[in-house]
UniProtKB/Swiss-Prot annotation:
Protein name: DELTA-urthionin-Uf1a
Maturation propeptide residues: 67-128
Signal sequence, start to end: 1-24
Species of origin: Urtica ferox
GO cellular component: extracellular region
């Protein structure tokens, strides 16, 4: 009987915690900003980081305030580029690195991330 009580208690606790987490809402000024935010979150970025990169705001409650469209700076674009590149290109190396990696994989992961950084920075310099 005690086992059932513990299970029911844990189930109720998880429902309450889930409700608390759902109450915060991300409000984005455009569909593009929403797509950037969602991609960032899917890639493992925190709510705060993804909101900063995309120009979205995290608000409590269920209603978004009227947002002015923020000016997206080159720095935010560069950070998003680096995050997306690292996630999509370097993911397999990083996954292997986290299992039973040797020094070769550590170096490969670092070089991959550096290449993403260089690529994104080079692109922004050329277009500026």
């Amino acid at each position: 009987m005690e086992g059932k009580t513990v299970i029911v208690s844990l189930l109720l606790l998880s429902i309450v915690v889930g409700q608390i987490q759902v109450e915060a809402k991300s409000c984005c000024p455009s569909t593009t900003a929403r797509n950037i935010y969602n991609t960032c979150r899917f890639g493992g970025g925190s709510r705060t980081l993804c909101a900063k990169l995309s120009g979205c705001k995290i608000v409590s409650g269920t209603t978004c305030p009227k947002l002015s469209i923020p000016e997206v700076t080159g720095e935010a674009v560069n950070e998003y580029c680096k995050l997306g590149c690292s996630f999509s290109v370097c993911r397999a190396i990083t996954t292997l690195q986290n299992t039973d990696a040797g020094e070769v994989l550590n170096e490969a992961a670092e070089k991959c991330n550096n290449a993403c950084s260089t690529l994104c920075t080079k692109n922004s310099i050329e277009t500026a």
